[in-house]
Amino acid sequence: MEQTFEAFVVRKDDEGFRTGIEQWTTEQLMDGDVTVRVEYSGINYKDALASTENGKIVRSYPFVPGIDLAGTVADSSHPRFQPGDKVLCTGYETGVSHFGGYSGLARLNGDWLVPLPNGLDARDAMAIGTAGFTAALSVQAVLHAGAEPADGPVLVRGAAGGVGSMAVAILSRLGFHVTASSGKKDEQGEWLKSLGAAEVIGREEAAPAARGALAAETWSAVIDPVGGQGTADTAKYVKYGGAIALSGLTGGGGFEGTVYPYILRGVQLIGIDSVYCPMDKRLGVWSKLAGEWKPEKALSSGIQEIGLDGLRPALDRILAGGAVGRYVVKLG
C-alpha cells in the first residue's frame, strides 16, 4: 500500500540547485528488501557536502541525503529482518548513491542493516552514528596496536568534532589519559574536559614545529579524524611503537613527511574505513558501543536534536565549521 511521508530532498535540474522538505510516496523510494520507518538520523560532514551543488557526493538527482538512520522495520523480504525489528544503518551506499535517512521511510538493502543492540535506543544510536562508530574503530585499532593506559597520553585531534568528541569519551571511559587538541580550545575546552579530556590544547600545540625528522616522544597513540599536514607533523611526536588511527581529511587530503617515525620508532599509521567495514566487525563494535564503550558523557551533553525543518541551517553550520558535538534529526 502506498504511503506518504516527508523527506529532505536535494534537486538539480533546469531550475537550478535547491534543497527542501517535500511530501513523497513509497513509489518514489529506491529498490531494497527492507523498508524502515526512520525515527532518527544524524548529520555528518559527508551529509553537509551532499547538500551542496559542488560537494562531489551526489551523482544523480533528485536525492535524499543522510548516511545514518535508525528506526523500525516496516516491511521486509530479507531473511534476517521482520517487521517490528529495531535497526540502524551507517555507511555502505546509504546517503551517497542510495536514498538515505532524511526521510520518514527508507527502503534499503538488508545486508547493510545492524540490529539495534540492547543498551541503545534509536536516538542514542544516531547520536553516536558514523562519527561514534568511526571513533570506536579508531580506538579499537590503537588498542590492537598495543596501546594501554599506562603508556601515557593519547592525543585526539579535532576533538570538538563528532569523531573527536566521541573518541575522547570512549578513551576516557577506558582509563586513558586523553589530550584533546582543537582549534576551538577557548570555546570548547570546558566541554571537552566534561567528556573526559585531561587537558585541552590548541592544534599547533599538538605538534610544535620541529627541525628534525623526529621530535620528543610525547603521544602513546593518536586518534586523527583531521588528516592533512598535521598527520605527518604529529607522527614526529609519537612514542616508540605507538599508532596513529587516521580516519578523515577535513585538514586536507595530503601531507609531506619522512619515513623516520615509522622505521626508527615503529610508529604505525592505520587507516580507518567505517563505510565498508565488514559486518562481523561492525556488529562487534556496535555491541561495545552499547555496553562497555558506551560514550555516556558524550550522549549526555553536546547533542542537539532538530527536526527536518532545522536541517538546512545545521548543514550550513557544519559547512562553515561552526558546529560542535553532534546533531540528531528526529523524524516522525
Task: Please identify what each model-predicted range represents.
Residues 68, 85-86, 105, 153, ...:
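Residue-level marker of beta-strand positions
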Residues 27-43, 54-94:
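Glycine-rich beta-strand-centered segment in the early N-terminal region that forms part
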Residues 206-217:
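Short amphipathic alpha-helix with an adjacent loop that forms part of the alpha/beta core around
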Residues 90-155:
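NAD(P)H dinucleotide-binding glycine-rich loop of Rossmann-like/cofactor-binding domains
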Residues 88, 220-223, 245:
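N-terminal Rossmann-like NAD(P) cofactor-binding module of classical short-chain dehydrogenase/reductase
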